[in-house]
Amino acid sequence: MIYKLRNWILKLMKLTGKIALVTGGSRGIGFAIAKILSENGALVVITSKDSEKIKKAEAQITNSFGITCDIKKKSEVQNVLNQTIEKFGKLDILVNNAGIFPKIKQLHEIDEEEWNEVLDVNLTGQFRFTKEAIPHLQKTSGCIINISSDAGLKAYQGFNADAYSASKAALIVLTKCWALEYAKEKIRVNCICPGVVDTDMTKPFLKNQKDIEFMNNEHPLGRIGQPEEIGKAALYFTSDDASWVTGAVLTVDGGESIK
């Protein structure tokens, strides 16, 4: 009876024995993804520039290990992969989640430094992590999840964040490129496009009840999303349930992008 119960529990925990790396995993969507992967048996490495936020996340996520990292620095990205392999011996899952959101400005108001910083973090940073992770994922037939945005799918009236939208659109195309490039090696690459989710990044848009009601009404399902809902989508892509899924772009946005 105990043996059967143990096997049943292990079956429910879809990621037992897996090593996952979640960039930007100390808060928001990244934290929710790291937490749900851990709850399903994975050992999760999380990265953040902020060491204090990493400590707080480690305290809340079972079987997690935090590493400080500036995604704009190649040497720090390499250090994350080196530490992960040295400590755990392999890598099964990479979640490219780290990102920044610029101030809302029209194109003529954006200076080149702002533009470059957004692309360096949101796009080139994902390239850096994926490039360093691929040799390890080749050994495990692992998977990659890119966290894009529905802002990468279409333009929104009044949403003047061109660099952000450009970086997220490019990540969608890269998902398909990488899925084709590494399909023969059984590495699956998929993408999630969240809508407006209740995180620190979206708080500037949700300053009062009027803002919240407006944003809720922008989504056909009548509300903004919760980080855990993106986490559940990520869990699907990392599990064997998605063993025949690669190059997919999943919108988790309450219907916002179909308007």
Where are these regions (language model features)?
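C-terminal helical subdomain
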Residues: 191, 213-241, 245, 254
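Active-site helix of classical SDR
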Residues: 130, 167, 175
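Residue(s) in the substrate-gating loop at a strand-loop-helix junction
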Residues: 149
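Conserved glycine-rich cofactor-binding loop
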Residues: 19, 26-27
